[in-house]
Amino acid sequence: MLDVCLLGSGGMMPLPYRWLTSLMTRFNGSSLLIDCGEGTQIAIKEKGWSFKPIDVICFTHYHGDHISGLPGLLLTMGNADRKEPLTLIGPKGLERVVTALRVIAPELPFEIKFIEITQPEQTFELNGYRLKAFRVNHNVVCYGYTIEIDRAGKFDLERALSQEIPKQYWKHLQKGETIESDGKTYTPEMVLGAPRKGLKLTYCTDTRPTNSIRE
């Protein structure tokens, strides 16, 4: 299941009931944040979500209303004694911009990994889903993002029974795992039907009309 929370949709300045641009997703126990405008931390708390599972933060571009909340979020993560590395993804210049913002957050107990987007389109494999970055038409270099999640076929009970596959292996095969036991190999394809239609979420902020969104 993919959970989606639009934390903010405002521009330029935060309003009492409309925080600056930010979107958060949850999948397979990890969270992804796209943009981190001023007040994003408060919006996360208001929605009852948590910053702790965030392992990837993406930026569409580097205008202040899309990134100014990052230093405070990094400090909060550090104060919570985070040890897991954090991956940041954004247009070229990401490391330079974040390094400048970290003047007020110079020491953190976790590693920050930078991935800079250098092509009009780039795809990343992250925690069981694909993240596609695509260039849009803004007055600075700006990207939208698409999350794609493949879905395996449904478990076929009759096939499992007809092939005499031990019941204790069913849940592992459903997860896509291959089991070897007593000289036999059991694969997910033996018990799963045709792949189901996947999930797709596209997020785009500042842009003029562009075909890259439709594609």
Predicted ranges, named:
Residues 1-47, 83-85, 145-147, 194-203:
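Conserved beta-strand hairpin/beta-sheet module of binuclear metal-dependent hydrolase folds
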Residues 3, 87, 111-113, 130:
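Conserved beta-strand segments of alpha/beta enzyme cores
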Residues 7, 91, 115-120, 134-136:
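Conserved beta-strand termini and adjacent loop/short-helix elements that scaffold enzyme active sites
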Residues 9-11, 39, 62, 93, ...:
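Active-site metal-binding loops of divalent metal-dependent hydrolases
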Residues 15, 129-214:
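Active-site-proximal loop/helix segment associated with metal-binding centers of metalloenzymes
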Residues 25, 121-126, 179:
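Short acidic-hydrophobic surface loop/beta-edge motif
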Residues 38-89, 113-118:
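Active-site metal-binding motif and surrounding structural segment of the metallo-beta-lactamase
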Residues 96-103, 114-119:
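A gly/proline- and charged-residue-enriched helix-loop-helix capping module
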